[in-house]
Curated annotation (Swiss-Prot):
It comes from Anopheles gambiae (African malaria mosquito). Belongs to the hemocyanin family. Larval storage protein (LSP) which may serve as a store of amino acids for synthesis of adult proteins. GO terms for molecular function: nutrient reservoir activity. It is found in: Secreted, Extracellular space. This is Hexamerin-1.1. InterPro entries: Di-copper_centre_dom_sf, Hemocyanin/hexamerin, Hemocyanin/hexamerin_mid_dom, Hemocyanin_C, Hemocyanin_C_sf, Hemocyanin_N, Hemocyanin_N_sf, Ig_E-set. Homohexamer. PROSITE patterns: HEMOCYANIN_2. Keywords: Glycoprotein, Secreted, Signal, Storage protein. It comes from the Eukaryota. The keyword Nucleotidyltransferase does not apply. Glycans are attached at residue 203. Gene3D superfamilies: Di-copper center containing domain from catechol oxidase, Hemocyanin, C-terminal domain, Hemocyanin, N-terminal domain.
Amino acid sequence: MKLLILAVAISLAVLASGSYVPSTKFEAKYADKEFLFKQKFFFEVLRNIHLPLKYDEYIPYTKTWVSDETKYNDFAQVAEFFDYYKTGAFLEKGELFSIYNEQYLRQTYAVFTFLYNSADWDTYYKNMIWARDNINEGMFIYVLHLTVMHRPDLQGIVLPAIYEIYPYYFFNTDVIRTINYKKLYDPKFGFYGNGKYNVVYANYTATYPMDYYNNFYTEEYLNYYTEDIGLNACYYYFMMDYSFLLGGDKFGLIKDRRGELYWYMHQMLLARYNLERMSNYMGTVKPLVWRFPLKTGYFSLLSYWNGVPFKSRDYNYMISDESYFKLDWINAWEAKIRKIIEDGFFVKEDGTRINLRLPESVEFFGNLLNSNVDSVDANYVGYIEVFSRLLLSGNDFNAYKVWPSALMQFETSLRDPVFYQLYERFMDLYYYFKRFLPSYTYEELNFNGVVIKDVTFDKLMTYFDYFDSDVSNVLPMQSTDKYFDYAVFARQRRLNHKPFSYTMNVMSDYTGKAIIRAFVGPKFDRFFDLQFYKKYFFEIDQYLVDFTAGKNTFVRNSRDFYWSVKDRTMYTDLYKKIMLGYNGQEKFALDMSEAHCGFPDRLILPKGWTSGMPMQFYFIITPYTAKTYEQGYQYDKTFTCGVESGMRFYDSLPFGYPFDRVINFNYFYTKNMYFKDVFIFHTEEMKMNQRY
């Protein structure tokens, strides 16, 4: 059956996989009933995840999986899952889950292969229903996201935002308790026609009394940023798109340069975090030093669904005597990495040498540290990333049961200030590797005949506004008739910026396609200081342009930026749109308006200062060059992110170019580059983004 109904219209579209571009015109695509049935299914099975399914149409499939081996693509893998599950060793429903546990990781992968290898939608659908009622809830959510993101037949499926599927990982305990309290004492709560009545205000940790929660560390001033639900969801989706469980020819993640992208994602997170620190008059983050007691503690105010709080880490934290062997392993693995960088090569188990003095070897290096499936020898450095998180969480990799901290969940990792210190330490390995690569030559930087004459900006303004999230999933409902007839919202104050545009004037002797890259970073006094400050430049935009001979003027709006995505539609609202489409009452557009694969548009600018924070934008124009991988599957940019396609990025230049290598100032500054001084102003006036 055809998946899509094609209609000519003006639609919301994407310029690239990670961006939401509302101004592009092309042939829009609308979902047919088969597609909308799938959409309806996912929204319903994710409702009230800790309760058994109550939909009559699903209940017959909750008791057993599809056992017919002809219904699977790789039954040998599926049979392994069947045998494994029958042992009774699987994590029980209701227990705390983290992927950073050896047994849970193996079980998660087994469930994934079972569902991924379901040969058709009917088999997948029935097996997913069985898994919904029989697999641990945390594991189920993890596997459902993996299959939806990576099964080719589910391209374009939109899931509810992760912070609305599982609000426990995004909203502090007092919010959850207040909602349940109101529901307990007011049966009409959530059903009133006046939606304002159903709002609960959600505070950040820093707004609570410091002495009560012992949160005296200065990092708490950044809670509005580190606890931002969009930022934390962004990291979750990246770690799921490029899950370390997946790889090889079957998935083709290597086509997206996953190893290099792993480094770059964390570098950009650190750059953006440091810009926010500068906005709050704080110094840049320093690399973690494996010396105990560790000053940086963390007391999360999150709790798991059963009321168990996230495991905390005391200030001046000491590891147990039994954990020092992990520290020895981490230090040994790190020493191995430094040695192969210095040696300039790595010898694989079969004797093949990998030359680490080639720029493309960054791919090998990233996969090695991530210990993912595409690593040529993950055992060489063990699981340095995993064990580092566990050591800082007071947990064991092979424990029978876990009490996870914020570092042990993708959704909450960015909340813990030690995350940034840890990855700054990892990034030091990356910078050390890059030191051995030659600086870019004049020819590699210059674009003959292209001169950026000037760039002008609108006034850059940031502010806090209120945003509502649908957190109805924390309320247990007994009747499916009521599942989507009520809605409860958590209202939170979030950083935002006024949309802005910049205008670039370029003189060109060149005719053809080119790429413009844009970064925002700190203002520095001397040009030579760029060697130090370049790692704090955050890439906000990258786009393809057509040059004609003579003067070219490009106007770019912040809403069109390549790397960013807009806020998501709320769970209940989106479900109602799906049902209107399913019942034939209106068309359901397939576009990137619900994209998960990008940085929150609201956060592309740091907060700045009320008096104006001096910053710089950096631009570079480069010729358009062919991408390394052209043979990935042909994804549709109108409604998918293109993970595994090898077509997500415009060219094959290194991520972060030209700041990714040591700068030779003898010829670095070329005419196709431009630094623009700006000020970012912060206003205390609240801009209300309310639903009602």
